[in-house]
């Protein structure tokens, strides 16, 4: 069943691209259908994240264990982010996508509305404070996952502290999680339709011809994402004894959905379910995967480092090695704000450009082709979340390798 859905999604991507290219108006008219699919998934995210984290935190039994898990998770996120940013800098310096570019003939997109969010990205104190919710209902309504995770951990640890009195509540959350996973299976039946509509709308709105003047930038980003998928992640697999290509095969349909929707939230419930079935403990899955949506965006990190060097080259700003390393340090911090604001990657790019003295007006040029790069980098984030989950599980000595049976293993009959 999973293979069938993956095949259907692949066909939907191709058909959607054809519709958008040859019938752009009709393709754009399909946007509400795709947006409806994304909304169906997003309505599940907060209940499933909150319930699974409460169960996992209560099962750990102490704040010390959850703290240890959190520290290991953050360390891994920072290590892999630094490696990816370094790869992006290397590629941009070697391939020089911005050198010789005629800026006068390039389409620019209005990014004025994004400038209001840049202060939020670089205000690190506020970013930390925002993790602590003043109103749990408010952060749930806004899908603020880091704040939801924080409250859920405290709730779960407190529940463990009162012993048997918390059993009715724990049963409620266990049932809630099971219901949400079942609801996810039902919603995923509509995935091919949603993917087709979103692809048709994207190609219809932006067109393929928009890519031609910016081919070197798009090509450099795509090459970097390819190297992450098929060089960096396999090396991580060798070091940590992870069957990477087995994992990639297991989540391939989720990769395609994230690619077409440009949102990893749309695959969060399914990814959590599969990682648990693959052998990662619930307490690790429920913490690492949701927090990774904000803190572990490998594809987005590569895009940011390549784009910053592209801006410097396009506007003939000579950046020394020390300046590039400083920029990478800034990106390590600012990239954690990607999920906190609309058009996250563009906002982070704009904030970083301002911080390191690059011409911010160049972001308007990149914004014109951002959609196609957004699709690719979002897809690459998915195996990054899966790898992080397994690495942390092994670090916790809690990974139990299970035989992954592709046929009907997680998509039950509805």
Swiss-Prot record:
Q: Which residues lie on this side of the membrane: Cytoplasmic?
A: 1-3, 64-73, 166-182, 241, 322-324, 367-414
What's an example GO cellular component term for this entry?
Answer: plasma membrane
Report the record's Gene Ontology biological process terms: amino acid transport; dicarboxylic acid transport
The known regulators of its activity are described as: Glutamate uptake is inhibited by beta-hydroxyaspartate and cysteic acid.
Q: State the annotated membrane topology for this chain.
A: Multi-pass membrane protein
**Could you list which ranges are Extracellular topological domains?**
25-42, 95-144, 204-219, 263-300
Keywords of this entry: Amino-acid transport, Cell membrane, Membrane, Symport, Transmembrane, Transmembrane helix, Transport
Q: SUPFAM superfamilies, alphabetically?
A: Proton glutamate symport protein
Any one Gene Ontology MF annotation carried by this entry is: transmembrane transporter activity
Q: Which Gene3D superfamilies match?
A: Sodium:dicarboxylate symporter (1.10.3860.10)
- Signal sequence interval, chain numbering: none
Which parts of the chain span the membrane according to its record?
A: 4-24, 43-63, 74-94, 145-165, 183-203, 220-240, 242-262, 301-321, 325-345, 346-366
Q: What is its main location?
A: membrane
Cellular compartment(s): Cell membrane
Function noted in UniProt: Catalyzes the proton-dependent, binding-protein-independent transport of glutamate and aspartate.
> What protein family is recorded?
Belongs to the dicarboxylate/amino acid:cation symporter (DAACS) (TC 2.A.23) family.
Name of the protein in its database record: Proton/glutamate-aspartate symporter
Please name the taxonomic classification of the source. Bacteria, Bacillati, Bacillota, Bacilli, Bacillales
Q: What gene name is listed for this protein? A: gltP
């Amino acid at each position: 069943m999973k293979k069938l859905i993956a095949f259907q999604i692949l066909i939907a991507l191709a058909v959607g691209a054809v519709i958008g290219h040859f019938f752009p108006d009709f393709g754009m008219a399909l946007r509400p259908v795709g947006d409806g699919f994304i909304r169906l998934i997003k309505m599940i995210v907060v209940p499933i994240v909150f319930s699974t984290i409460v169960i996992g935190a209560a099962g750990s039994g102490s704040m010390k264990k959850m703290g240890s898990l959190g520290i290991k998770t953050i360390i891994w996120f920072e290590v892999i982010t630094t490696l990816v940013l370094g790869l992006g800098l290397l590629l941009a310096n070697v391939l020089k996508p911005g050198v010789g570019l005629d800026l006068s003939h390039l389409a620019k997109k209005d990014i004025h509305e994004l400038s209001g969010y840049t202060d939020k990205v670089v205000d690190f104190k506020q970013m930390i404070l925002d993790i602590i919710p003043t109103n749990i209902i408010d952060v749930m309504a806004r899908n603020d996952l880091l704040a939801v995770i924080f409250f859920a951990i405290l709730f779960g640890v407190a529940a463990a502290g009162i012993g048997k009195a918390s059993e009715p509540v724990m049963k409620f959350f266990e049932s809630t999680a099971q219901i949400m996973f079942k609801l996810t299976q039902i919603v995923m039946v509509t995935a091919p339709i949603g993917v087709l509509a979103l692809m048709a709308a994207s190609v219809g709105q932006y067109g393929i011809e928009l890519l031609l003047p910016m081919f070197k930038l798009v090509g450099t980003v795509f090459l970097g994402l390819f190297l992450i998928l098929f060089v960096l992640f396999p090396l991580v697999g060798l070091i940590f004894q992870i069957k990477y290509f087995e994992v990639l095969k297991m989540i391939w349909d989720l990769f395609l959905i994230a690619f077409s929707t440009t949102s990893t939230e749309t695959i969060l419930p399914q990814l959590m379910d599969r990682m648990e079935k693959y052998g990662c403990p619930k307490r690790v899955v429920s913490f690492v995967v949701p927090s990774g949506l904000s803190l572990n965006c490998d594809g987005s990190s590569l895009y940011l480092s390549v784009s910053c060097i592209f801006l410097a080259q396009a506007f003939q700003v000579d950046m020394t090695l020390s300046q590039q390393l400083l920029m990478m340090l800034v990106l390590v911090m600012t990239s954690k704000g990607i999920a906190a604001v609309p058009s996250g990657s563009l906002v982070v790019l704009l904030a970083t450009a301002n911080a390191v003295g690059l011409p911010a007006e160049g972001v308007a040029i990149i914004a014109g082709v951002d959609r196609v790069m957004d699709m690719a980098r979002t897809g690459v984030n998915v195996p990054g979340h899966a790898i992080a989950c397994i690495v942390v599980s092994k670090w916790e000595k809690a990974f139990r390798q299970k035989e992954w049976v592709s046929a009907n293993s997680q998509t039950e009959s509805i």
